[in-house]
């Protein structure tokens, strides 16, 4: 994901998966998920990879940017272990979703069991996130609403709106015979991202 930074900063990759076959990849994914739920496997791998790097480099702080929870536990542990300033950047939070769109994979069990697992999973994610927020030196997020929600767990929450770096992206005027609107996000569900009103408005223009 961060390979584009190569050449500007040192980039290190922590890999969790090695399998290449379709079936073996699925089995490995299930095994890693099992280890992560029981023992925090993914966070431990990050911690073990980062401690030697921190010892041999002059880092000034730890920044963890995430949309859900992972890898906040690893970042929190490293910050406590090294006594470095700890900044958490939350672009999206679980509370903003209408349902369970924040879950990457459905559990595919019985409906009642799915509901039970999802409820427990959500509670676990929020507990781990909030534990990390409580020890953070600063929290940044993207809207006034997000700020108010996160201030329940850390009083030092700063607002930084989403945007783009003008040094990397230059606006251009491109002439075209078609009216083009580009949406670069994901339509996770109609409950929180419903484009029907936009389509209806455009239909009235044509």
Name these PLM-found stretches:
Residues 50-71, 84-91:
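Short N-terminal targeting/anchoring amphipathic segment
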Residues 19-37, 57, 84-126:
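Acceptor-binding helix/loop patch of EC 2.4 sugar-transfer enzymes
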Residues 60-61, 138, 180:
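Structural motif
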Residues 44, 48, 70, 77-81, ...:
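Membrane-proximal helix-turn-helix segments that form the acceptor-binding/catalytic region
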């Amino acid at each position: 994901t961060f390979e584009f930074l190569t050449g500007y900063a040192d980039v290190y990759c922590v890999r969790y998966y090695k399998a290449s076959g379709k079936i073996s990849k699925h089995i490995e994914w299930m095994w890693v998920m099992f280890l992560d739920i029981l023992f925090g496997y993914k966070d431990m791998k990050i911690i073990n990879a980062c401690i030697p790097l921190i010892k041999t480099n002059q880092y000034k702080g730890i920044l963890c940017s995430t949309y859900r929870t992972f890898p906040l536990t690893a970042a929190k542990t490293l910050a406590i272990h090294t006594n470095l300033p700890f900044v958490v950047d939350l672009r999206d939070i679980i509370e903003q979703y209408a349902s369970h769109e924040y879950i990457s994979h459905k559990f595919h069990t019985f409906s009642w069991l799915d509901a039970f697992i999802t409820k427990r999973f959500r509670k676990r994610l929020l507990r781990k996130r909030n534990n990390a927020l409580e020890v953070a030196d600063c929290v940044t997020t993207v809207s006034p609403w997000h700020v108010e929600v996160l201030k329940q767990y850390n009083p030092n929450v700063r607002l930084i709106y989403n945007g783009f770096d003008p040094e990397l992206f230059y606006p251009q005027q491109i002439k075209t015979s078609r009216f083009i609107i580009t949406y670069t996000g994901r339509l996770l569900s109609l409950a929180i991202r419903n484009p029907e009103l936009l389509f209806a408005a455009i239909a009235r223009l044509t």
